[in-house]
């Protein structure tokens, strides 16, 4: 191919590649074409280099490459011994656990749904029932006594909301009213100089009037535990309770008496088996009881020693459990066994504690530790433990049939600190209290459902405060708990904190653990707040019980603080008449009132009224505070508040029901009182009050349009100057007055300037001489009168600039503006 043919082919190819689009052609140089060729060549050689080398290598060795490729594709990388499909391991225990939990959850969920549906149905049933009763009551109220008035209405008589004999509204229920009546009677006795036992009184009322055995039992145990010789109010109840063995003896005696009652009832229920006989006594009762309870060989298995054909130690134990040491000693004497134990029992019964008794206790403890710890007779072990006060951690499971048995056993092995033996482990009163309150607690005794039981356990262990606080948590028992606390405090057996601001139940660092102190003030105040507005008389009787507690805010005792707070919250005429008595219109004094019946020497009703007035004054309720100051005879404080109120509203026009209008009645009462008791008030206060009342009259005349009378009042009292010559005199007079007068001075100057300006306008619009309230000798014609008015206006502006008080900018602007308008 020559060069011409090659050129023709190139042109033909060029023509074929040309398109109709107007895309510009790309021209490359030879160097660019060479570079692009190298790039394409490098890409092709890199992609195929590895495969080509592999083919060359294997082909030279005689390997059939296509077959090799097929074999490689058929190979699998997985191990032949593993299954192709993954199989998870079977965990039977986890599967069963999961199924069991799912079943439990499904049951719980189903139960919840059924309970919710049941509650929902019950709720709507009750709602529909209440709606039906309301509709019947409304229809019954609409339908009159004559059926002829509504012939088409069918009705039946149902109980209406109103009683046949309406009674006064009260927040107290029947039980609370009974308690409140007894509190009022008790307070009256205290006022008359008598001091009855409130706890015994309330216990008898509950027994006779309340149809609740659990509440009566709680009062009975509290009454029994406090049936001790009275103690002085100066002795701390907590320390006395912890150091005196009488409380432990009382608790044990209570449990022993209750057990004797149980034994009698048990024997009466089994008279055929009991075979009672002989003289009625604990000795024969125990014999009958043991004869019924321990029948058959199985019941007698493991018991030691026999007396008259019956086991000995059950008789001794139940005699001690019944509180009769004589019967226990008689059984031991009849059997002739354990003479040392009989001697110890006799010494313990007689109250002797000498060297012989200490020696016997040591010998018997050695015998117990060496031989009786492994004894199979639980009654014998219990007798030794009770008489020797040892082995406090042994549970005596065979004999503990109730919490009473457990408590009696623990109380029987208690030893005071002065009787403790360092060589043996013994139980103390504080240890038993901690065991009941802290170790076992409410959950162990199921206190939510068995509140009476838990209360009795705490009371029998001397923890009155914790027991009452527990009862006070529930609405059902709160009323009983509060009155139990009141009754204990009245006989000086309730431990109260040092500060009335403490929580309801608190601990004192000086008290032995776990003893608590109950804040009686907080308990009573929370209780009375519910009804103090509707049953004020009853609330005051409860507050009277707090007269011996000191208030933290420095307002005397807590009773005064509570009554003061009550009056501050509700200080209407009815409340004032109830507490302070009826007002005598002649002299303004109040006579009667329930507060006077309490005869509080530290603070009479006048001091109480002053205290309430001070509190109302702090809260900004000045009108009520003034009324209380009137009752308390505090004219000075009443005048100060009246001055403060007058300074705020004296410039306002009079309107019915406004503060300014009500101040008029107060001013009339103050004027009448100042005639008699003006010497009791500071002179400065009286002067300020007098000036403000004059200013009040000035503004009354000003708003009524009596301009002449208004200016005469100010001129006569030298409050504003009549001319420029009197400015200094008026400023000096203002300085001697109280801040209340200075506060109202801008309004006085504005009103006075307005009066002068109105007179100026009237004078300029008239051809007559000046108004009649200017001196006719000075105002013979219009010009002197105008000059006099301008001079007076100038005096007002000068006075506003001279007083030692920063006038409002609007006042100065208005004064200058009116003065300029008069030129």
From Swiss-Prot:
Entry's Gene Ontology BP terms: chromosome attachment to the nuclear envelope; negative regulation of gene expression, epigenetic; nuclear pore organization; oocyte karyosome formation; poly(A)+ mRNA export from nucleus; protein import into nucleus; protein localization to nuclear inner membrane; regulation of nucleus size
Annotated signal peptide: none
InterPro entries reported for this sequence: Nucleoporin_int_Nup93/Nic96 (IPR007231)
Cystine bridges: none
Disruption phenotype: RNAi-mediated knockdown in oocytes and nurse cells results in irregular distribution of chromatin to the nuclear periphery, leading to disrupted karyosome morphology. RNAi-mediated knockdown in the wing disk results in de-repression of genes silenced by the Polycomb group proteins complexes such Abd-B.
Matching Pfam families: Nic96
Name by which UniProt lists this protein: Nuclear pore complex protein Nup93-1
